[in-house]
Amino acid sequence: MQIREVILDGESLTIEQVLAVAYGQPGTPVVRLAPIARQRVERAAQAVQDLLARGVVAYGITTGFGAFKDRVIAPDQVERLQYNILVSHAVGVGPVFDIPTTRAIMLIRANTLARGHSGVRLQTVERLLDMLNQGIHPRIPCKGSLGASGDLAPLAHMALPLIGLGEVEWQGEVLPAATALERLGWQPLHLAAKEGLALTNGTAVMCALGVIETARAETLSATADIAGCLSLEALYGTPAAFDARLHALRPFPRQIECAAHLRRLLAGSTFVRNNDPRHVQDAYTLRCIPQVHGAVRDAIAYARWVFAIELNAVTDNPLLFVDDDGNVEVISGGNFHGEPLAIALDYLGLAVAELGNIAERRLMRLTDEASNTHVLPAFLTRAGGLNSGFMIVQYTAAALATENKVLAHPASVDSIPTSANVEDHVSMGVTAGLKLRSIIDNVSQILALELFAAAQGIDFRRQELGSQARLGRGTGPVYELIRQYVPFIAEDTLLHPYITIISELVAQGKIAAAAAVHDDADA
């Protein structure tokens, strides 16, 4: 069901809503503040003004930041302090985030502020949402965050357009934020006390990466099952290892789910061996798909749990607690520390890398006639020597799998002290998220290469089976989808365009969707 409206209250934002806003057109769905959120925001903003009137010393409101935490700011400079944090912290480098990630960042940050513990004014949160709904997207360099105190540098870039600084992308054009505001008839905001800090201090960037990449990993997980089954059919393997009774004796729920998925995909196939005494079991890369892919599903489920919580967390510092009588307490803490997210991102990265490792080994088996016991010709070509066939397809997969082994090294164990050793342990959560994004990109390509080779192998097997050839209930539609765009490769030709096509089918979720239509019951 299409999501047409997202109401932010700081407590109920879902992963599906974030994805709808991230990938939707500006204003579809429209994002608004809930009435309760408006009340909370206004109450906390008034509490900040009360603190100033009483001369209370509070971090980031009447003091400097980081190592300057004990430098008290004069009352007539507190607003300048908030301007200064944006311009001094907007020092990110590297390519800018894509628009879906940028939109997710803006939405998540607004939801955090909507909880009413950060002290920003209502007009500030609403301006951020106005930008989101109008499709005014800040240009946010992707590198520069340590993941504590939150994502300072990228969030400073996100906030710059609120005050008429920085660059935005709007209606397909990159332009100064001031120009975009002028065209809309909007005045730049003058930040009040606490607002610059509240906009920049939090985990919205690593959380946005986590939400988007978790969703991509879910699609890849389903695609990996499909690729594995198509390879098993091409290799004349046996589905005996997917028997429900076997998996019930090792009751990891997602291993059991994966095995059931494989059975549904292969239901009705004549390409597999059943009760063949000459071939009682396959190599690990086929036989152990449920154990490996199931473990990856566990990592994905854990990541989804983490990011579902973080979407509705308040990750600012300090936080304001206002009671029913209007009394306020300011508490300095560490909710900005991204360790829970960084560990989840690292965990998901190494898990998804395993999908690529096992897929590359299946691809090797498809191309090596010795490994596949001559079920398929060497490198999937009849005229080997004159033709190289799929030889270098496997090389590319091997290169990508090897790159992922480097990328899978965890970022979260590699803290580095900053701010004169005041901020002496950091999470490196955005680094973990960017690595995860690269791993997922690579695995998407590896699975495309496996599907390309498996479809080629199926055609060789089809020649052998003749009129008896029938693919599984789930694998058959996927094979047909591939063959709509990519032919059987009878002799050497330029393969790259075909790889690009299948890669797009994988990335767009069309491979998973083709099988899912036929995945409505257990086998």
From Swiss-Prot:
Query: Cross-referenced Gene3D superfamilies, in alphabetical order?
Result: Fumarase/aspartase (Central domain), Fumarase/aspartase (N-terminal domain)
Which key words tag this protein in UniProt?
Cytoplasm, Histidine metabolism, Lyase
Tell me the route in metabolism or biology where this protein functions.
Amino-acid degradation; L-histidine degradation into L-glutamate; N-formimidoyl-L-glutamate from L-histidine: step 1/3
Where found? Cytoplasm
Modification note? Contains an active site 4-methylidene-imidazol-5-one (MIO), which is formed autocatalytically by cyclization and dehydration of residues Ala-Ser-Gly.
Residue numbers of 2,3-didehydroalanine (Ser) PTMs: S149
Q: Where is this cross-link: 5-imidazolinone (Ala-Gly)?
A: A148-G150
Q: Record's superkingdom?
A: Bacteria
Alphabetical list of PROSITE patterns matching this protein: PAL_HISTIDASE
Per its UniProt record, what InterPro entries does this chain match? Aromatic_Lyase (IPR001106), Fumarase/histidase_N (IPR024083), HutH (IPR005921), L-Aspartase-like (IPR008948), Phe/His_NH3-lyase_AS (IPR022313)
Give an example GO biological process: L-histidine catabolic process to glutamate and formamide
From the UniProt record, list the reaction(s) this protein catalyses. Answer: L-histidine = trans-urocanate + NH4(+)
Molecular function GO terms recorded: histidine ammonia-lyase activity
**Predominant place of localization:** cytoplasm
The UniProt entry, under Pfam families, shows: Lyase_aromatic (PF00221)
* Transmembrane spans: none
Which GO terms of the cellular component aspect does the record hold? cytoplasm
Query: What Enzyme Commission number(s) does the record list for this chain?
Result: 4.3.1.3
What family is reported? Belongs to the PAL/histidase family.
Name of the molecule in the record: Histidine ammonia-lyase
